[in-house]
């Protein structure tokens, strides 16, 4: 699922509110999956080059970080929950990242990864194309998922 906004109506939608507004399709989606990876954006000046990996599936967070580090060597990847600001950890039980049986990982991307420098705007928004870094993230996450050792992550 995705929450897409236009430039005219930016709104912070707390993840913990999704279930209150979820359609039947979203509710059914969660009945058919074992784990989830959610992608969020955040902005903290002191963390502009840090990708935060929250959520309750810590083994999966470490696995994803190992692939993301290769794809984006200029960024740091924080998977230690104590180093992630409390409100960005993705640990609340109503957060969609924690609904599936194996929970998941909440990937928080800083503005420096979401901003398309060539087109001077936010990636994939209002006619702005996707920034190269966003493609790098997508490709790294795809590789990480394909390399999942299923006996460790999927059968607990």
Residue ranges and their predicted role:
Residues 1-156:
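N-terminal catalytic or cofactor-binding beta/alpha core of small enzyme domains
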């Amino acid at each position: 699922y995705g929450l897409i906004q236009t430039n005219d109506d930016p709104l912070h939608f707390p993840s913990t509110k999704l279930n209150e507004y979820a359609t039947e399709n979203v509710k059914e989606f969660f009945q058919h999956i074992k784990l989830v990876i959610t992608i969020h954006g955040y902005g903290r000046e002191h963390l502009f080059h840090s990708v935060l990996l929250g959520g309750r599936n810590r083994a999966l967070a470490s696995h994803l970080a190992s692939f993301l580090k290769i794809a984006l060597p200029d960024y740091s990847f924080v998977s230690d929950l104590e180093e992630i600001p409390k409100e960005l950890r993705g640990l609340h039980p109503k957060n969609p990242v924690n609904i599936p049986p194996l929970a998941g990982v909440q990937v928080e991307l800083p503005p420096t990864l979401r901003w398309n420098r060539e087109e001077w705007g936010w990636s994939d928004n209002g006619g702005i194309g996707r920034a190269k870094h966003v493609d790098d993230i997508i490709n790294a996450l795809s590789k990480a998922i394909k390399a999942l050792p299923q006996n460790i992550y999927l059968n607990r």
